[in-house]
UniProtKB/Swiss-Prot annotation:
Residues that coordinate or bind ATP: G63, K64, G65, G66, V67, G68, K69, S70
Role of this protein: Component of the cytosolic iron-sulfur (Fe/S) protein assembly (CIA) machinery. Required for maturation of extramitochondrial Fe-S proteins. The Nubp1-Nubp2 heterotetramer forms a Fe-S scaffold complex, mediating the de novo assembly of an Fe-S cluster and its transfer to target apoproteins.
Gene Ontology CC: one annotated term: cytosol
SUPFAM superfamilies hit by this protein: P-loop containing nucleoside triphosphate hydrolases
Sequence positions that bind [4Fe-4S] cluster 1: C9, C23, C26, C32
Family: Belongs to the Mrp/NBP35 ATP-binding proteins family. NUBP1/NBP35 subfamily.
Descriptive protein name: Cytosolic Fe-S cluster assembly factor Nubp1 homolog
Binding site for [4Fe-4S] cluster 2: C240, C243
Record note on quaternary structure: Heterotetramer of 2 Nubp1 and 2 Nubp2 chains.
């Protein structure tokens, strides 16, 4: 049996495993530093066992913060759950320092309960459940000031110790960029024997400052050999509710997501407008996907493409 890793452990799969100062005195140092021994995190087997009844895993990524990735995750989940009532969906919020899903899903103040089979995720609807570190905080204003290894440990717990049950799709709301959290979740979910073990959707806005970082996110997925279902362009335009005039709040100076997707050879799933009603509903934790409007019309096509990609 291996001992628990030290606080600043670089990770057993890291090239620095067993070689940095944090490794000094660790009982596992000789194991990690031996190039002849396979460096595979023992937690990976626990994750695989815990998620054996989860058919598909979908990372929701964004290169830039503020593009509405968490809002898009919520909208996708709610629309999918409404459109496929016989399927079960889960949401895992792994934005450890900025958990948004409890508010967006209308679950603020809910508690996570421990059972014999692990943590029980919070039920949102009959076929939707949610897990977030936001449920474990004493107050919504509590700051989480953790280094990478502690975040990674929390992600491993969420993946291996939550009783997700039978899910058709688990959506993972990630922080922006390509940080420790992304490397950690990919290492746990990726199965080399099954290339389709985890997929990704990337969220952007039309302006070049967001697209620059999305290109990096696409390259990250390609290097990690994660199939990209497609890109969603959020806040693509605003239609006045009074006169019907459309305005580009974030002008696409370089062609927007469509041009970038053509350049990077990835699918464009669709575009979502900037809608004040959606923002208001998300702040209140309300489901607005049953109301027919430009956003839900766009979601219909996007969600159909997502589900088709798994068949």
């Amino acid at each position: 049996m291996q001992a628990p890793p030290p606080e600043h452990c670089p990770g057993v799969e890291s090239e620095q495993a067993g070689q940095v100062s944090a490794c000094a005195g660790c009982p596992n140092q000789s194991i990690c530093s031996d190039p002849n021994k396979k460096r595979e995190d023992p937690g990976k087997a626990l994750v695989a066992a815990a998620l054996k009844d989860v058919k598909h895993k979908l990372l929701i990524l964004s290169g830039k913060g503020g593009v509405g990735k968490s809002t898009v995750t919520t909208l996708l989940t709610r629309y999918l759950a409404r459109s496929y009532p016989d399927s079960n969906f889960g949401v895992l919020d792994i934005d450890i320092c900025g958990p948004s899903q409890p508010r967006l899903m209308g679950a603020l103040g809910e508690n996570v309960h421990q059972s014999g089979s692990g943590w029980s995720p919070v039920g949102i609807d009959d076929n939707v459940c949610l897990m977030s570190i936001g449920f474990l905080l004493g107050s919504v204003d509590d700051a989480i000031i953790w280094r990478g290894p502690k975040k990674n440990g929390m992600i491993r717990q969420f993946l291996s110790e939550v009783d997700w049950g039978n899910l058709d799709l688990l959506l993972l709301d990630t922080p922006p960029g390509t940080s420790d959290e992304h490397l950690s979740v990919v290492s746990y979910l990726k199965d080399d024997s099954s290339p389709d073990s985890v997929h990704a959707i990337i969220v952007t806005t039309p302006q070049e400052v967001a697209l620059l970082d999305v290109r990096k996110e696409i390259n990250f997925c390609k290097k990690q050999q994660i199939p990209i279902v497609g890109v969603i362009e959020n806040m693509s335009g605003f239609q006045c509710g009074h006169c019907g005039h459309s305005s580009e709040i974030f002008p696409a100076k370089t062609g927007g997501a469509a041009a970038m997707c053509a350049e990077m050879e990835v699918p464009l799933l669709g575009s979502l407008p900037l809608d004040p009603a959606i923002a208001k509903a998300c702040d209140a934790g309300e489901d607005i996907t049953s109301v027919k409007n430009p956003t839900t019309e766009a979601l219909e096509g996007i969600c159909s493409k997502i589900m088709s990609s798994f068949n």
